[in-house]
Regions:
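A short alpha/beta connector and helix-capping loop motif
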Residues: 14-39
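Structural preference for beta-strand elements that scaffold enzyme active sites
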Residues: 2-4, 29-33, 53-59, 119-123, ...
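Boundary/entry segment of secreted carbohydrate-active catalytic domains
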Residues: 1-14
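Acidic (Asp/Glu)-rich catalytic clusters
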Residues: 20-26, 44-55, 73-80, 114, ...
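Active-site beta-loop-alpha junctions enriched in small/polar residues
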Residues: 8-10, 35-37, 59-63, 125-127, ...
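Active-site gating loops and adjacent loop-to-helix segments of metal-dependent hydrolytic enzymes
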Residues: 66-94, 211
Length: 245
């Protein structure tokens, strides 16, 4: 079996950038997805360029911060910010202009490309794939990239995805045992499993803008542990990135 440990939220704070970098240099993370509208975007770009082996994707968002574009009336609140989470976006979905979705997501992708980075894959912040999948699929075809496999989406066409996507390593599920259980579920197969991760060092920015904070340091500890790397080696698990699909 093969595993992609993808680190979401690259750029959300300096601590997240450096936590993901350390999880790449000393751990099992080989892929990460960058928020184009994130506070530490420029730092993330700099770090990515200094570490070309770190596979970069776009962490497309309609539920975090402010959009790249202005005038997106169906996607933003009175303050010009995106709705705060999946539920808020879903509840107003009937009024969302999918043309605005396409333009904003394209702007996010183009910002990353304009910074000089190559993009291998797309995923979304707060797992909004089921709400915007037709647009995301179209953009994946346009840019020739892979996608995260979402349980609520069945038709990926010719777009490459992992065989399975695991969200188990999150919040109360952040443990070495969680990863061991996932490995035992797929050991002996040729399947590619993506495990979602969010490693980070806690900083003031992260404390201010994210509700998911403390578990990120535990994720970082596990993902950089010699125990995990030794176990994966013993089980003959190959660690790959989205570039390898």
């Amino acid at each position: 079996m093969k595993i992609i440990f993808n680190a979401d939220d690259f750029g959300i704070s300096p601590g997240a950038v450096y936590g993901i970098l350390d999880s790449y240099k000393r751990g099992v993370v080989k892929s990460t997805t960058l928020l184009a509208n994130s506070p530490a975007f420029d730092l993330a770009v700099e770090v990515a360029k200094e570490n070309p082996g770190l596979d970069i994707g776009a962490h497309l968002t309609l539920t975090f911060g402010r959009p790249i574009l202005q005038g997106l009336e169906t996607l933003t609140d009175n303050d010009g910010c995106f709705r705060k989470n999946y539920t808020a976006l879903e509840s107003g979905l009937a009024d969302v202009d999918m043309g605005e979705v396409e333009r904003e997501l394209t702007a996010q992708i183009e910002k990353i490309l304009a910074a000089g980075l190559m993009i291998s894959h797309f995923d979304t912040h707060h797992s909004i794939e089921p709400l915007i999948y037709p647009v995301q699929h179209m953009l994946a075809e346009k840019y020739g990239v892979s996608l995260r496999r979402h349980a609520d989406v069945s038709d990926f066409g010719t777009i490459k995805t992992p065989d399975f996507f695991a969200t188990d390593f999150y919040a109360d599920g952040v443990s070495f045992e969680t990863i061991k259980k996932l490995v035992q579920s797929y050991i002996g197969t040729n399947d590619v499993i993506e495990i979602m991760t969010h490693p980070a060092f806690i900083d003031d920015t992260l404390l201010r803008i994210s509700s998911y904070v403390q578990p990120r340091t535990k994720e970082h500890t596990i993902l950089t542990s010699g125990e995990l790397q030794a176990y994966l080696g013993q089980q003959e698990v190959e660690i790959i990135s989205f570039r390898d699909l």
